[in-house]
Amino acid sequence: ALDPVKGPSRVEVVFFEPEKFTDVKDAYMGSDKGRDATLELLKDYLTTRGVRGLLPGQKLAITLTDVDLAGDFEPWRGGQWGDVRIVKDIYPPRISLAFRLTDAAGAVVNEGKRDLRDMAFMMKLTMGFRDDPLRHEKALLDDWLSAEFRSAKKP
C-alpha cells in the first residue's frame, strides 16, 4: 500500500515462481498460505531495510528466485516433531536473488545476481531478532545489504 507520508516505496521486492522455492514451509507438509505469509514477512523486511543503504533518488528492485529457510523438518523423529523446524548448522539459510539499483534518472547504477548463504549462522548473535522465526534469514539479508550497498553511501 502507498504510504501518503513517504510516497511510493523506493524498494520493490518480487518473488519469481515462489511455488518452486526450496523451503519456505511453515510445517512439514506446508501450505500456500503459510509460504505466502513467510514471504510477505521477508518482503516487508527487505522493503524497510533496503532503503537504509540508498542515496536520495535511488531505487532498488529485488527479485527473490529461491529461499531455503534455516533448519529443516525431520519427520523421522515421529509424532509431534514432524512439524517442528530443527535448526542445525547443517541446514544454513540460503537465498538467491537478482537486484537492480537505479539512480533518480532511472539509469542502472548496479545490478547482479547473488546466492547468499551463511554457513556460520549458528555462531552469530542475532540479538535484535532473538524471538523471530526468520532471524537467520533477516541477518543474512542484512549482511548482504550492508556489503552490497555500503559504497552507495560513500561520496
Region locations from a protein language model:
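A structural "domain/chain start" motif
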Residues: 1-40, 58
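A short, structured loop/turn motif at beta-sheet edges
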Residues: 5, 52-60, 100-111
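A mature extracytoplasmic/lumenal domain signature
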Residues: 15-19, 64-68, 101-103, 113-118
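Short secondary-structure boundary motifs at beta->alpha junctions and helix caps
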Residues: 28-29, 109-143
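N-terminal post-signal-peptidase region of extra-cytosolic proteins
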Residues: 39-49, 77-86
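Surface-exposed short loop/turn segments
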Residues: 64-102
